């Protein structure tokens, strides 16, 4: 956009407008320019992207024929990279195939070529799917992907199953059945509300605080790291997937930013009546006791040496309020934290707790009774929903604090072979 403003040409009026174009046109224009350079140089100078990268990049694009969300990029993909490096005749356009068949074959080709399950992270929430009868493990490429896969959050290099291998059963995959290996980490027994699921914005935070209050102390340590994170620390590290400003794990200072964030929420909520269009009534509280987040109790339960204990919290509250009144306080430093919370949870991912006391964040559609699995070559844990026939449906990827780097493999849990459909 900066370069375009220097020489706007025919785009001058567009740049003056308040039109919001989003990322899709920019990505399409980038790919168009790359294709033009390839044509000019006979493909000798400009390196072009893998098919997988193109599918990622243009997930937000629209197409009158959903099959073209795959077929349109076959001619632009680098044939020396996967999947064509090992399957040169893969994905030949055939409009006699249904959308379901094209998307299932695409998932089969990509996963069997890369020999990992990371493509599962591209499955959108069930509430967003539009193509019917797709296997649960096959992304619906006809719709935009929101939120984006967690692996794009930062340099975490998660490997929940360590270096365990997975061998694709291609014949079964083409039939819509994905055979995988892994360990069942736990069952989900408590979930939070999302921000848009209640008319009162405090209800979501109240459910999140209740999740944190239900955690055991000490928090599970399957990796025998010797770490004893408090409830508040587990909470903010889970809410941000332990990433702050592309740093993993998040620096401890992020926890203090989180405290400031909570203070700002509480102050804003308590002042709501003052900004109401109705006449202010001193006896009126905008929040009922039932849904008001019980932060005080959470801070009271912090260990004596915790930087989040109640005395530290109240001291910081006094400092923030005083600086607000004298005009020296600025919440601008919370902008990055808000971004991390939005990307990791907030309106798009649901916080959960498991029976063994793990806390995690996952797909919007997850619910109590779903199971958390560490699948070989999956990178992250996944939430699965058991079916009456013994198979499973994929709900989505997840972040589970404390088991993102192979720690679950030390828990003595049984390795199982299961089928996703």
Predicted segments with their positions:
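Acidic/Ser/Thr/Pro-rich low-complexity tail/linker regions in eukaryotic proteins
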Residues: 1-421
């Amino acid at each position: 956009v900066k370069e375009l403003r220097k020489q706007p040409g025919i785009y001058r009026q567009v740049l003056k407008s308040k039109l919001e174009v989003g990322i899709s046109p920019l990505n399409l224009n980038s790919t168009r320019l790359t294709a033009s350079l390839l044509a000019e140089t006979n493909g000798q100078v400009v390196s072009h992207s893998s098919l997988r990268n193109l599918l990622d990049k243009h997930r937000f694009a629209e197409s009158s024929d959903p099959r073209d969300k795959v077929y349109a990029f076959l001619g632009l993909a680098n044939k020396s990279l996967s999947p064509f490096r090992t399957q040169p005749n893969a994905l030949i356009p055939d409009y006699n195939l249904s959308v379901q068949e094209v998307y299932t074959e695409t998932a089969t080709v990509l996963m069997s070529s890369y020999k990992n399950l990371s493509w599962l992270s591209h499955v959108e929430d069930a509430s967003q799917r539009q193509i019917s009868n797709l296997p649960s493990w096959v992304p619906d490429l006809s719709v935009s992907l929101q939120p984006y896969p967690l692996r794009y959050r930062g340099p975490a290099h998660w490997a929940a199953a360590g270096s365990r291998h997975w061998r694709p059963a291609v014949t079964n995959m083409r039939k819509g059945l994905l055979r995988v290996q892994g360990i069942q980490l736990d069952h989900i027994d408590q979930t939070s509300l999302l921000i848009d699921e209640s008319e009162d914005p405090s209800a979501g935070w109240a459910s999140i605080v209740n999740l944190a209050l239900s955690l055991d102390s000490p928090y599970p340590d399957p990796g025998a790291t010797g770490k004893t994170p408090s409830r508040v620390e587990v909470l903010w590290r889970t809410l941000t997937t332990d990433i702050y400003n592309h740093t993993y794990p998040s620096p401890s200072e992020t926890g203090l930013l989180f405290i400031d964030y909570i203070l700002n929420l509480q102050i804003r909520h308590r002042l709501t009546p003052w900004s109401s269009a109705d006449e202010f009534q001193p006896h009126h509280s905008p929040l009922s006791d039932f849904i008001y987040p019980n932060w005080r109790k959470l801070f009271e339960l912090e260990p004596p040496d915790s930087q989040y204990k109640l005395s530290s919290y109240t001291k910081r509250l006094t400092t923030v309020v005083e600086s607000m009144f004298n005009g020296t306080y600025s919440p601008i430093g919370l902008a990055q934290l808000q971004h991390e919370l939005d990307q990791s949870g907030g309106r798009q991912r649901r916080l959960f707790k498991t029976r063994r006391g793990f806390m995690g964040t996952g797909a919007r559609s997850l619910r109590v009774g779903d199971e958390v699995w560490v699948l070989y070559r999956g990178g992250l844990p996944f939430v699965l929903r058991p079916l009456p026939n013994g198979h499973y449906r994929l709900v989505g990827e997840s972040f589970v604090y404390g088991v993102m780097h192979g720690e679950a493999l030390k828990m003595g849990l049984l390795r199982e072979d299961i089928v996703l459909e």
